[in-house]
């Protein structure tokens, strides 16, 4: 299941240790080159580079610690409006998107804690939630930047990848599945291919 974020798990956390990791550096270089090819050297390039670096950090931290620092989520939300076409649309779509998932989280969490826990006779499920505290701000970011419909594409991709990985984890008897890495992957994929999505589903997206 998707985990709540535990602050105590972040003890000893250091951003520097992640930045010097070779795989992280390679991923950062690849995304930076893509952004440079897309925007050239401009303000948008700089802001998007920062945003994607934050997403990478959040993903790695969540995957390792099952928790994320609040200041990175706050930084993401404060910077992202600068690359949005409209601040008002960013705020509106972000609130609508996040609000919808907060309600969904309530129902799914109720099912996990009150129904599934009794069916499986597993008391540990009574403490689990469908989404962690750190997932909602990232969902708001996705909705604000991509809009409602493209945001749904990103969530669908994230959920599909999470489902596949969750099945693998279940086969290995690993229950904990952090969701932020999948949300980040879904967002980046849609961001990279959004023109293709527009061309394929333009009638639905623009309606």
Where are these regions (language model features)?
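A membrane-topology feature that recognizes alpha-helical transmembrane segments
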Residues: 1-207
């Amino acid at each position: 299941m998707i985990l709540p974020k535990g602050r105590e798990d972040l003890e000893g956390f250091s951003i520097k240790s992640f930045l010097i990791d070779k795989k992280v550096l390679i991923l950062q270089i690849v995304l930076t080159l893509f952004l440079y090819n897309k925007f050239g050297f401009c303000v948008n390039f700089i802001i998007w580079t920062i945003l994607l670096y934050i997403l990478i950090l959040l993903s790695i931290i969540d995957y390792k610690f099952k928790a994320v620092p609040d200041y990175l989520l706050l930084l993401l939300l404060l910077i992202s409006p600068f690359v949005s076409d409209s601040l008002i649309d960013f705020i509106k779509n972000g609130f609508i998107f996040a609000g919808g998932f907060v309600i969904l989280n309530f129902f799914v969490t109720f099912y996990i804690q009150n129904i599934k826990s009794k069916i499986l006779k597993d008391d540990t499920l009574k403490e689990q939630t469908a989404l962690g505290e750190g997932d909602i701000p990232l969902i708001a970011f996705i909705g604000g930047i991509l809009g409602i419909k493209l945001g749904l594409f990103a969530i669908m991709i994230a959920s599909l990848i999470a489902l596949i990985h969750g099945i693998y984890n279940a086969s290995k008897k690993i229950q904990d599945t952090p969701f932020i890495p999948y949300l980040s992957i879904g967002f980046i994929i849609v961001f990279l291919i959004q023109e293709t999505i527009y061309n394929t589903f333009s009638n639905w997206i623009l309606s």
